[in-house]
Swiss-Prot record:
GO terms for molecular function: structural constituent of ribosome. InterPro entries: Ribosomal_bL17 (IPR000456), Ribosomal_bL17_CS (IPR047859), Ribosomal_bL17_sf (IPR036373). Keywords: Ribonucleoprotein, Ribosomal protein. Part of the 50S ribosomal subunit. Contacts protein L32. Transmembrane segments: none annotated. The gene is rplQ. This is Large ribosomal subunit protein bL17.
Length: 113
């Protein structure tokens, strides 16, 4: 059984796509994507927020290695981490919004709680 979804992409493309999705989610707080991409984005976004809650230098460097925008990382450590200090996981919510018009792919919003 696979530990992650392959999303029909090669490894490098999939990892870069997920890094972009996580960066956009942390920047804007809400993005629209397919349900399967949202589920994979949730895994990594929750890991980044948990690292930010630790707040030490090593955690910041680990997040900087994954998130593509330094201002997003600063926002994550200064604003979002204190907001979720009392919450043990479950930082995101996926809301299904129905099929996409072009190819009927199941779409969803993923947002920070």
């Amino acid at each position: 059984m696979a530990k992650y979804r392959k999303l029909g992409r090669e490894t490098a493309h999939r990892n870069l796509m997920l890094r972009n999705l996580v960066t956009c989610l942390l920047r804007s707080g809400r993005i629209e994507t397919t349900v399967t991409r949202a589920k994979e984005t949730r895994r990594m976004a929750e890991k980044m927020i948990t690292l930010a809650k630790r707040g030490d230098l090593h955690a910041r460097r680990q997040v900087l290695a994954y998130v593509m925008d330094e201002t997003v990382v600063n926002n994550l450590f200064t604003d979002l981490a204190p907001k979720y200090a009392e919450r043990n996981g479950g930082y995101t919510r996926i809301i299904k919004i129905g099929p996409r018009k072009g190819d009927a792919a199941e779409m969803a919003f993923i947002e920070l709680v």
